[in-house]
């Protein structure tokens, strides 16, 4: 099946995020009533959120746009089930992270297939990154460390460390208990901290950034 990419908003156009609870309430009314343009409005309001979650979870690569499109298509098909305005954002985040976890599993299965069949390894996706060579190298190394996490721990790590969600929010988004969310976050953080401390490039980069920030 050919991937579908949504092009509601030109890449150079400014996003218009929902700024108030009233905005989300008005959007939910539009969704429930099936008003014209609610899909475009949702895309414009939440594209930055979804794109950021996918990017932070999987690293910068050529498939990000396709995955973002998948998320919004699933959202468009099921958004009518939402009953509370406060749930619009968390519902979309939940769809995003479920899609990310499926993609993580797909990639791991693909790597195993290449390993056992003796074929060539899958082509490494093009990685975009910052202009600073050190920052780009650090991003690649960190992405590799995050890649080592299983799909569930990775999702918890991204939501906690990169999105700043608390354990209650993480549990709601991932559909798990508070204790399970806490356990996944702790396990992921311990893994990342341990691996970063053993990575000379990352350790030096973080030290330099800290010195510049405090200087």
Per-segment meaning from a language model:
Residues 33-36, 125-158, 163-173:
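Amphipathic alpha-helical segment used for protein-protein interaction
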Residues 22, 29-52:
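A short, charge-rich alpha-helical start-of-domain segment used by transcription regulators
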Residues 43-61, 77-78, 146, 198:
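Amphipathic, Lys/Arg- and hydrophobic-enriched alpha-helical face
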């Amino acid at each position: 099946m050919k991937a579908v990419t949504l092009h509601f908003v030109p890449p150079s156009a400014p996003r218009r995020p929902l700024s108030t609870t009233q905005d989300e309430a008005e959007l939910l009314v539009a969704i429930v009533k099936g008003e014209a343009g609610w899909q475009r409005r949702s895309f414009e309001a939440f594209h930055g959120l979804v794109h950021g979650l996918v990017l932070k979870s999987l690293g910068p690569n050529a498939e990000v746009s396709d995955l973002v499109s998948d998320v919004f298509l699933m959202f468009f098909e099921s958004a009518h089930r939402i009953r509370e305005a406060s749930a619009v954002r968390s519902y979309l985040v939940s769809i995003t992270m479920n899609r990310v976890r499926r993609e993580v599993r797909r990639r791991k299965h693909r790597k195993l297939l290449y390993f056992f069949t003796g074929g060539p390894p899958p082509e490494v996706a093009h990685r975009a990154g910052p202009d600073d060579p050190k920052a780009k190298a650090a991003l690649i190394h960190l992405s590799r460390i995050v890649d080592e996490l299983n799909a569930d721990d990775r999702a918890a790590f991204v939501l906690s460390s990169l999105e700043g969600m608390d354990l209650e929010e993480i549990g709601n988004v991932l559909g798990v208990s508070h204790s399970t969310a806490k356990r996944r976050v702790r396990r992921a953080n311990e893994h990342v901290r341990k691996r970063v401390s053993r990575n000379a490039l990352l350790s030096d980069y973080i030290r330099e950034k800290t010195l510049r920030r405090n200087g």
